[in-house]
A protein has these predicted regions:
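Sequence/fold signature of self-assembling virion shell proteins
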Residues: 25-78, 90, 98-231
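Short, glycine/acidic-rich hinge or "gate" loops at secondary-structure transitions
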Residues: 1-20
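Polar-ligand-bearing catalytic/cofactor-coordination segments
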Residues: 93
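Surface-exposed acidic, glycine-flexible loop patches that form ligand/cofactor-binding
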Residues: 77-85
Length: 231
């Protein structure tokens, strides 16, 4: 979450200390490019967000419109590539539980039922992006996760916020370090105690990265919104 969010955030359940700027020494987190950050409500920046700038369907509308219209031309910006599921373009948006709460409470009963109907319709598909989803809105499959990056220093420094992640295809990439045999994992077996016990060891070197091109994030947008604990 920190890698694709581009920030450590304030999550107490992350392993790294809150003051950390890198998961691995010498490999600092890369901040999100400014052109790929959307702010909920009337906010236009981190420092002018207020508690009422909550996550809503309008936040998703902004992200979809941005994904469909920006890039792909002489500006050198790469347009977000959607996932292609059964011939239909789809995106995935990962929200924090607090953002889900705000979206539910700001959405009319009919709207939320329509979102959930879409999830029910897609349950018959075999593609895993629909498994466990909250629903679908404008081709965006919604999922929640309590590890989505949160903050507590927005606005004047006292607004709790969360960073939803809107993703197309290959929003994150993985690279493996492999031995000469070209395999991603090493596997070794050794008998011990006069062949009464079999010891097995495996190892791999893998890294995850949010792709960028010319300093711009590729295939993902983040949506920052106020997100206070609702209880």
């Amino acid at each position: 979450f920190m890698n694709i969010s581009g920030a450590r955030g304030s999550n107490a359940d992350y392993i790294l200390p809150t003051a950390s700027t890198a998961a691995i020494e010498g490999q600092s987190l890369v901040a999100r490019s400014s052109g790929n950050i959307i702010y909920a409500g009337s906010a236009t920046a981190k420092n002018n967000m207020i508690a009422d700038d909550k996550f809503s369907l309008t936040s998703i509308d902004k992200a979809v419109t941005k994904a469909e219209t920006e890039g792909g031309g002489s500006d050198g910006v790469i347009r977000i590539t959607p996932l292609r599921i059964d011939g239909v373009d789809k995106y995935v948006c990962l929200v924090h539980n607090y953002q889900e709460h705000d979206m539910r409470t700001s959405t009319t009963t009919g709207q939320w039922l329509d979102i959930q109907k879409a999830a029910t319709t897609n349950n018959g598909t075999k593609n895993p992006i629909f498994t466990g989803s909250l629903g679908e809105y404008r081709g965006v499959v919604l999922h929640k996760h309590n590890k989505v990056t949160r903050f507590k220093d927005y606005g004047a420094g006292n607004v709790a916020a969360a960073r939803a992640i809107f993703m197309g295809r290959q929003a994150m990439v993985a690279a493996f370090g492999s031995p000469a045999n070209g395999l991603r994992f090493d596997w070794a077996e050794e008998w011990k105690d006069y062949k009464n016990r079999l010891g097995i060891a495996t190892k791999c070197i893998v890294g995850l990265k949010r792709p960028q091109f010319n300093g711009n994030d590729v295939n993902s947008i983040v949506i920052d919104s106020a997100a206070a604990q609702p209880y």
